[in-house]
Amino acid sequence: MTNSLLICFTILGLAASSPTKPIGDIRIVGGEDIVITEAPYQVSVMFRGAHSCGGTLVAADIVVTAAHCVMSFAPEDYRIRVGSSFHQRDGMLYDVGDLAWHPDFNFASMDNDIAILWLPKPVMFGDTVEAIEMVETNSEIPDGDITIVTGWGHMEEGGGNPSVLQRVIVPKINEAACAEAYSPIYAITPRMLCAGTPEGGKDACQGDSGGPLVHKKKLAGIVSWGLGCARPEYPGVYTKVSALREWVDENITNLRLKHILRRF
């Protein structure tokens, strides 16, 4: 496989090699089984009936995910499963009524890898379904602080998906060190953050894309991309929510207003 770069387009169900970017559909490696009550904000983003990406419930009618998970397809191609420890059963299914991805996102750079989904029927909150707060605009995670990543992605590089929700605990990596690790081929921008362990073995991987990275009980990152999975020399790369919080807030408001106005 060219340069060992695995490109997993979960929304298309295709895998191909590329010399340019090792993009997402990331998975949990080195994690542990958990139940949904431990991460009730975690959702499965389903594309035409099958799990394709993770997502995070930030309001009863809003899911945040990665742009590369939903770009170029219609809202009706997606449904959201909430309240289940399993991506293929249980919980409740909700239609996606509309979506927006960042206009400056592109697959070449993976910069601005963020999207929001609007649900015409808000979810019902309970023990297994709950929204999570997002980090504040321009807030920073101190280097070395613990973050939590959850999802149903592959449990090893090139492996299969688990049926039960997984969790992995990884420290936040200094941006300069992360940029040096990926240089000169890949750029770490101000809208990305990195997390992983120096010895490797713990990471997100294929199938986790779009899912949450949580710091101090707030959504701080979105699983985006990486070179391989859980490799010691290459931390996982996440969309930095604090750098894009203003865009998220603005577009949540725009989507809601758009559909309120359509009623009149």
UniProtKB/Swiss-Prot annotation:
Family annotation (InterPro entries): Peptidase_S1 (IPR050430), Peptidase_S1_PA (IPR009003), Peptidase_S1_PA_chymotrypsin (IPR043504), Peptidase_S1A (IPR001314), Trypsin_dom (IPR001254), TRYPSIN_HIS (IPR018114), TRYPSIN_SER (IPR033116)
Pfam families associated with the record: Trypsin (PF00089)
Cystines in this chain: 53-69, 178-194, 205-229
UniProt-listed GO biological process terms: proteolysis
One of the record's GO molecular function terms: serine-type endopeptidase activity
Glycan-bearing residues: 251
Cleaved signal peptide residues: 1-15
PTM annotation, UniProt: Cleavage after Arg-27 leads to beta-VTN protease and subsequent cleavage after Arg-89 leads to alpha-VTN.
EC code: 3.4.21.-
Keyword Cell membrane listed: no
Propeptide position ranges: 16-27
Alphabetical keyword list: Disulfide bond, Glycoprotein, Hydrolase, Protease, Serine protease, Signal, Zymogen
Domain Peptidase S1: 28-253
Active site residues according to the UniProt entry: 68 (charge relay system), 113 (charge relay system), 209 (charge relay system)
Positions that bind substrate: 203
Family per similarity comment: Belongs to the peptidase S1 family.
Function comment: Responsible for the degradation of vitellin in eggs at the head pigmentation stage.
Identification of the protein by name: Vitellin-degrading protease
